[in-house]
Amino acid sequence: MKITSASLFALSATALSLWAPSGYARQNDNTQLVTANRFQQPVSSVLAPGEVITREDIDRWQAKSLTDVMRRLPGVDIAQNGGPGQTSYIYIRGAEARHTLVLIDGIPLAKSGITGIADFSQIPLALIQRIELIRGPRSAVYGADAIGGVINIITENSEPGGQITAGLGSNRYQQYDAALRQKVGEDTLVTAAGAFQSTRGYNIQPQSAYAVDGDRDGFRSKTFWAGVNHRFSDSLSAFFRGYGYGNNSAYDAGYQDGSDKRQVYNHTYEGGMKFSEERYSSELTYSYQRYKDYNYASTLGLYGPGTSLDDMSQRNLQWGNSVAMANGTLSAGIDWQQQKLVSRDRFNADSYRRNNTGYYLTTQQQFDTITLEGALRGDDNNQFGWNGTWQAAAGWAFMPDYRLIVSYGTAFQAPTLGQMYGQSRLFVASNPALRAEKSHQIETGIEGLSGPVEWHLYVYQNKINNLIDYRADENFVGTYYNVQSATIKGVEWSGSADTGIFTHRITLQYIDPRRDQDNEVLAHRSRQQYKYQLDWTALDVDFDFAWQYFGKSYNNNTNQYAATQRRMPGYTLVDFAAAYPVTSHLTVRGKIANLLDKDYETVYGYRTPGREYYLSASYSF
């Protein structure tokens, strides 16, 4: 029997038709979220669109990378230069990839390189215990970068126990990880974890005219995590954690002795104190990150003449406070950040430093059926001065189980150090006059519980001014500059329901992202997205089925070197996974990714994986 997308979706639709009124548990879910306003609150109370992904979700989906996880979420589009370990870009609600603020345990992720884009392909999935996603502007809460949204990756698990996992898959995929969380006495929890992941990969550019590009492009990652939490009293505790990873990936150079290997090294150390008593809580955290990114030619070696290095060190100090009030919560704090970037090759080196101090105030208040939310923030940056942002939202529960939401928010994106001061090794000239990108978004939404279906509908418009773009002269010396603006309009609907043994999740999205100067659609954005996920348990086996459709997009925007846009066709992906608990401690899992073996590209000329098979086993104790 031939398996088709239509037949699989028909099976899902049949299951969906079996709805029974059991969806209220999801509406009354007490899942807590911190990222929206920097204080803990139930997901159902947040006025911004948000998602919480747990480690249990990641294991059920049997995701192999962070991009696998993010692709399932509402409002998220992904472009990647091939398979595992290859450069990836995540677009939230049509905003640029650099317009997403990425936090690790609430601390901004250090990003090397000139673009200011977080490369999700380099963040090991084994580190992640939980992900919180907020869609829409959040600069009034966190400062720069949060134009399209915020992704907070949480690495800590406070539950004692341990787990060992081993897995194999297509293209000689291997996965091994172990974690142990042990209580020492009544007040101390010690955690240690490590992971290894590798794949032989495949040739990501089979159409390349260069013989050196005919090899496989593999990936290897090693990860560690260690931490200790100690409680001095019921109100005072302290923590320290350190983690890091080393990644090796291969890619295609395009010419003899060109860079075709990448090595990334990251290590992070964090420590802090937490105080909580009655209505008041406070947390003080210090973090140090070091991120080194090498690119080199395999024919010349890591220390050969063609090697380049981006070496970023980042220090963060955060002091946050929250007070529970009669009708809600008030939060205020200070963020300090120092970045130092050294970018070099054999002949040239560029060094930059930046300091930023931010002051924020956020609140949410409840008055009968009205919920009000607001935030103010000011950032003092030694390179581009003072920048203020604000946002406000109101929710009205106009009838039981239904709420109307209106929000407005401003945001900004600071130029990177490399964009402002150039990188001579990359023939990028300086432009210290670059202005910060600024945006303002207005959004309306309605959400409700209709029978078994919990649903959310949002309509939004995001206007981004001073967009930063790149151009080069006739000698190929380039510079970054501010262009006019872009406007992104969108509508998204998401819903979920429990029907007997089945749990359904559906996302429908349409966006219209355009440059204002010529009405051209922005590159790498699928204007239509349809996503369906079905989870169920039968005969003690947990099943997961995911169907995703991404509409057509464009690979580029026009410039002096590209007179037209290259159209990228839409594509459909289907994944299927199953897990069986052999004992109360041992679970075996299997997955077929890209079940229909679709041949598609998200970046022109870069092949994506075909059908792949995975098998793993986990032992918990």
Regions flagged by a language model, labelled:
Residues N28-W61, Y89, A97:
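N-terminal periplasmic "start-of-domain" segments of outer-membrane beta-barrel proteins
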Residues T67, R71-I107, Q129:
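Extracytoplasmic beta-strand/coil segments of soluble accessory domains associated
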Residues M70, I131-L133, I151-I153, V406, ...:
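Non-catalytic regulatory/gating segments with a bias toward low-complexity or hydrophobic composition
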Residues P108-R135:
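Short acidic/polar hinge/loop motifs at secondary-structure boundaries
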Residues S139-A140, N152, E159-Q163, G167, ...:
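Periplasmic-side early beta-strands and strand-to-turn transitions of outer-membrane beta-barrels
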Residues S233, A326-S331, D335-N465, R505, ...:
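Structural signature of Gram-negative outer-membrane beta-barrels, strongest in the C-terminal barrel
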Residues Q256-G272, S276, D310-R315, Q383, ...:
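Outer-membrane beta-barrel signature, preferentially recognizing the C-terminal barrel domain
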Residues A326-N327, Q365-L372, V459-K463, Y481-T558, ...:
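Gram-negative outer-membrane beta-barrel transporters
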